[in-house]
A protein has these predicted regions:
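A short beta-strand motif that forms the metal-chelation/ATP-contact edge
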Residues: 108-117
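A short, polar/proline- and glycine-enriched secondary-structure boundary/capping micro-motif
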Residues: 65-70, 121-125, 205
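Structural motif
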Residues: 4, 26-28, 53-56, 111, ...
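N-terminal glycine-rich anion-binding loops that anchor highly charged ligand groups
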Residues: 1
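Internal nucleotide-binding/catalytic subdomain
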Residues: 5-6, 10-98, 104-108
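Peripheral (often C-terminal) accessory segments that flank ATP-dependent C-N-forming ligase machineries
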Residues: 11-14, 18-19, 31-33, 138-219
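Active-site "cap" helix and flanking loop/linker of ATP-utilizing ligase/carboxylase catalytic domains
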Residues: 86-101, 116-162
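Electropositive phosphate-/nucleotide-binding environments in soluble metabolic enzymes
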Residues: 9, 77, 81, 97, ...
Length: 219
């Protein structure tokens, strides 16, 4: 049996879609959602049994009223390189295959390592050459890993989870009329993420979309 992939509850639909795109079987289990830190950095690695390692760039994660906004970080390059070296050494010294999610404070302190696909991996579905979800599947099936590098350096993505009583059709029409560049992708009827790239005021625009989808604002 292929290796089992662990991921946060609510992300399984994205893993299933990636498996369908690859035309391969899937074996996974979910774990509960954890409380997020205020603002922090995330670096993800995917290791396969055939000694391949894909290390994704550091991204910055911002907490917005319980939702996570993820974007490329503009912190000092030497500082970020030192974190990547630390993660690379840790991954190579580990005998574990699969996904590892490293959480760092903005000052570089290692907070925790999760051996699973977490919500911090959402960004890769839109802005990595090969998503973390796809590479996790490739590693589980001992297939060659894809490229983890960024496709763009100007983007932001945020998750949403709207009350089930809300109608979701009208908000979509309203948002796309005001910003055709939105990517609104659902994991279920009332949850998913909003992504936007190559635009000014990315945080403001994406936060507005999430607020509107969740009924926090009406215009």
């Amino acid at each position: 049996m292929d290796a089992q992939i662990t991921l946060t509850t609510g992300l399984d639909e994205f893993l299933i879609r990636s498996a369908n795109d690859l035309g391969i079987e899937i074996n996974f289990k979910t774990e509960s959602i954890r409380d997020a830190n205020e603002n922090y950095l995330s670096i993800v690695t995917v290791a396969s049994a055939n000694t391949q390692l894909a290390m994704y760039p550091a991204v910055e994660v911002l907490n917005y009223r319980g939702r996570l906004a993820i974007k490329p970080t503009d912190l000092n390059e030497d500082f970020l390189e030192s974190l990547l070296v630390q993660v690379n050494l840790s991954a190579k010294n580990s005998s574990r295959d699969g996904v590892s999610t490293y959480i760092f404070s903005l000052s570089g302190e290692l907070i925790e390592v999760f051996n699973s696909i977490t919500i911090e991996s959402l960004w890769s579905l839109e802005f990595a050459r090969t998503s973390i979800f796809e590479n996790a599947l490739r590693a589980a099936h001992q297939l060659p890993l894809g490229r983890p590098d960024l496709k763009s350096m100007n983007w932001l993505i945020m998750n949403f989870d709207a009350p089930r009583i809300l109608d979701m059709k009208q908000p979509y029409k309203h948002l796309f009329a005001h910003e055709p560049g939105y990517r609104i992708v659902k994991a279920a009827s009332h949850s998913g993420y909003v992504a936007l790239q190559d635009s000014e005021d990315l945080f403001k625009r994406v936060a507005h979309a999430v607020d509107y989808l969740e009924g926090a604002i009406s215009e």
